[in-house]
């Protein structure tokens, strides 16, 4: 994929390896809004507007370096898709969501977002995140650990967190940005165990944090959609831990990429 970095934007040549709709609407990030001819996305106090232009796409931002990493532009997704296309079950999902890329989002933002995501839908998750931003800093950016920790359980209930309010309140007292960064050096099994030890984080949420925050490809988050997919392609099975392990064994280090193509396809059909 070819792209050019300028002072205030990235220009991406027309390609099958980048599509903002595929990327932003496949459940890996929630702080974005659809605008005319594109999307506005926020991450770690940075913002960008992605628009379609004659030659491809433009990412307009004051922090070009951040969004080059955020959209994982240096990774060869054509090569990843070629490897996954060896599996017949991946042909239609990759054709449908060919422009997906795995985002490199902020660790703390990812953790909080996916605690909020448990048994929730994307529109409601977005409303909660935007309400937290407004409450903590007037909507300027995703709240810092310090800003969120200053909120009471009642404050968290007030923005719509429901039963997740006391869970997030406790998690904020178990870990902060520095601790999450320290865990980068752990292998995926040890890191998952650390995450699951935190309040409000089960296996599926932990795997989402591993994939979208830590960039670990050797995980396969399993939710209702992926459970249905597994039963359709393989065998009736309700043990999501076993489903995840079977799919990681199958796809190896590309399991996380396979999950995103399959999730986007399954949810849309």
Describe each PLM feature range.
Residues 1-269:
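HhH-family (HhH-GPD) DNA N-glycosylase catalytic core used in base-excision repair
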């Amino acid at each position: 994929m070819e792209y050019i970095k300028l002072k205030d934007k990235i220009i991406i040549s027309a390609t099958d390896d980048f599509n903002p709709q595929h990327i932003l609407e496949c459940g890996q990030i929630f702080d974005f809004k659809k605008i005319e001819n594109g999307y506005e996305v926020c991450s770690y106090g940075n913002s960008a507007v992605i628009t379609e232009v004659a030659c491809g796409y433009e990412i307009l931002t004051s922090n070009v370096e951040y969004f080059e990493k955020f959209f994982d532009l240096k990774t060869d997704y054509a090569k990843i898709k070629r490897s996954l296309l060896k599996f017949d079950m991946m042909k239609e999902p990759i054709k449908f969501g060919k422009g997906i890329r795995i985002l490199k989002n902020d660790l703390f933002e990812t953790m909080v977002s996916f605690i909020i995501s448990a048994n929730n839908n994307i529109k409601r998750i977005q409303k909660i995140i935007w309400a937290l931003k407004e409450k903590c800093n007037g909507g300027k950016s995703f709240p810092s650990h310090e800003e969120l920790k200053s909120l009471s359980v009642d404050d968290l209930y007030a923005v719509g967190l429901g039963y997740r309010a006391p869970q997030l309140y406790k998690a904020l007292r178990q870990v902060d940005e520095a601790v999450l960064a320290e865990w980068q050096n752990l292998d995926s099994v040890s890191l998952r165990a650390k995450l699951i030890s935190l309040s409000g984080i089960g296996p599926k949420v932990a795997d989402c944090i591993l994939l979208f925050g830590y960039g670990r490809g050797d995980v396969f988050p399993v939710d209702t959609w992926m459970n249905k997919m597994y039963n359709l392609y393989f065998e009736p099975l309700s043990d999501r831990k076993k489903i995840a392990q079977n799919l990681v064994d199958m796809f190896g280090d590309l399991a996380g990429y396979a999950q995103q193509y399959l999730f986007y396809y399954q949810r849309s059909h």
